[in-house]
Amino acid sequence: HRRYIELCPNINEQFKFFKRVIYENLGIIEFDTLIERLKTEKRALCIVNTKKCAQQLYEQLSGDGVYHLSTSMYPKHRKKILAQIKERMSDKSKSCVLISTSLVEAGVDLDFNSVYRQVAGVDSVIQAAGRCNREGIEKKENSKVYIFDINGMKTVPGQSLQSSITKGLLQDLSLIHIS
């Protein structure tokens, strides 16, 4: 008979902070549908798997309060854009939509009401969700992470296994206890 020591007492209380968003699987959607959804958002981050897709989305959405980040940009330029985004987001009355590649998933302190994440590995989806209701101030019902794939867009080489695992999990969200 073995004895176990609970390393994380009050586990439900400890992890309550991580249950600050609702995940929604949008499935396969059209590129134009994604654009229309993003146009209705007040504060949203959309992370796609390729620089080309990020650029195309940005060009379709471009306007006041729409920003684009990718690894194609020089670090100094990205830093300047991040500063502009933070400045804009400091005024709650202004909208802000950021189109990016996975570079914003870690090490970027931004907080959005909605995050759209193109299907990728589960770790990437979780990292993206970390940009939604980051402070835990908003109600969970107002903090959504939308997972989608774009109709006709090929999976990035090297990501097909991770993406297929995520797609399998998304078929039954109850398996991963995230809402």
Task: Please place each PLM-identified region on the residue numbering.
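Short Gly/Thr/Asp-enriched flexible loops that form oxyanion-binding sites at enzyme active sites
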Residues: 111
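Generic structural signal for residues in well-ordered beta-strands
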Residues: 21-23, 66, 145
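Conserved two-lobed SF2 helicase motor
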Residues: 91-104
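C-terminal helicase lobe and adjacent C-terminal extensions/tails of nucleic-acid helicase motors
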Residues: 32-40, 47, 52, 56-62, ...
